Amino acid sequence: MREVPHVLGIVLAGGEGKRLYPLTADRAKPAVPFGGAYRLIDFVLSNLVNARYLRICVLTQYKSHSLDRHISQNWRLSGLAGEYITPVPAQQRLGPRWYTGSADAIYQSLNLIYDEDPDYIVVFGADHVYRMDPEQMVRFHIDSGAGATVAGIRVPRENATAFGCIDADDSGRIRSFVEKPLEPPGTPDDPDTTFVSMGNYIFTTKVLIDAIRADADDDHSDHDMGGDIVPRLVADGMAAVYDFSDNEVPGATDRDRAYWRDVGTLDAFYDAHMDLVSVHPVFNLYNKRWPIRGESENLAPAKFVNGGSAQESVVGAGSIISAASVRNSVLSSNVVVDDGAIVEGSVIMPGTRVGRGAVVRHAILDKNVVVGPGEMVGVDLEKDRERFAISAGGVVAVGKGVWI
């Protein structure tokens, strides 16, 4: 029987998420609600907890209050067994300064690693939508003998220019790691696809500590995990790529196996929601064998009255649809859609109300928005452009607490 390694999870959750504005005006990107019942951070935490990695530090910085509260209310583990998920803001142990990058966040938090003394460290991002069994990646890392392993997802070469791209040999060793190249490299077995980094890493502990310390002494570094630490280890011949398509998650369907989305823009965030709503969704939220855990509020069930209906939609607990039509949309908890209103192809966050006879199309409404009776959002983009953010793809985004 193989010895069970001691693994510490570090989740990088300090992202500001400027491209998701106005959704990040009052919260960190990992705290943005998603999918009717979750926050973005719930996906990485669910993956780690499902794999029984139960000692997790979440490094936070930007407008972290709602993120900290969400973790403390919904992610309590058994302290008696030494299990924890703890938010860790910048401690300023090394002087009065904030994190200057993801690698610097770990450098300033090295005490967490020394205290836990793990064999391996899982360093994952906090703002992607996916299912993954990290234990399989840890086993790959151990068997490969690498000091660092980068999770790579296959994308068509022509679509890879916006990502950090990985060039690996037949054994999986990374030969080069390049951010946003004009000519992305092919994979060893398919020249038409490219491995792009998912922002998920496994490190042997000493390798990470040595690399982080060396990076901290480099005045020319941006102190970024993907931009500085990984290239440093690639140059030393110590990095391998883990093919995400090899990851087998219990209960996965053929459609959502190897699903992963970077939701860093309004259009990507919107599109990922539309992946949830069909009868056979591109990403299935209802996999009981690998559950995504989210809000644990005690709410009444959703209710449909006076002929109200929802088709190809996700409707959260506590919501009421009254003589209204909801189609191809995701509604979070405590949403009210009043008589005669129409909601189509939209994402509605908790506590929002769509008034009598109002129309909302191709839009994202943040928490506690009120759309007045007869008002329209997403119908006249020129009018909307004067008062709301509109994405490159024409998605109208309305900020938190706005009355229309």
UniProtKB/Swiss-Prot annotation:
Alpha-D-glucose 1-phosphate binds at residues 99, 164, 179-180, 197. It is an enzyme of class 2 (transferase). GO terms for molecular function: ATP binding; glucose-1-phosphate adenylyltransferase activity. Disruption phenotype: Inactivation of glgC reduces by half the extracellular (capsular) alpha-D-glucan and intracellular glycogen contents. Cells lacking this gene are not affected in their multiplication or persistence in the BALB/c mouse infection model. Combined inactivation of both glgC and treS results in a complete absence of maltose-1-phosphate (M1P) and alpha-glucan, whereas combined inactivation of both glgC and otsA results only in a complete absence of alpha-glucan. The keyword tRNA processing does not apply. GO terms for biological process: capsule polysaccharide biosynthetic process; glucan biosynthetic process; glycogen biosynthetic process. It comes from the Bacteria. Its EC number is 2.7.7.27. SUPFAM superfamilies: Nucleotide-diphospho-sugar transferases, Trimeric LpxA-like enzymes. The keyword Nucleotide-binding applies. Belongs to the bacterial/plant glucose-1-phosphate adenylyltransferase family. PANTHER family: GLUCOSE-1-PHOSPHATE ADENYLYLTRANSFERASE, GLUCOSE-1-PHOSPHATE ADENYLYLTRANSFERASE-RELATED. This is Glucose-1-phosphate adenylyltransferase. It comes from Mycobacterium tuberculosis (strain ATCC 25618 / H37Rv). The gene is glgC.
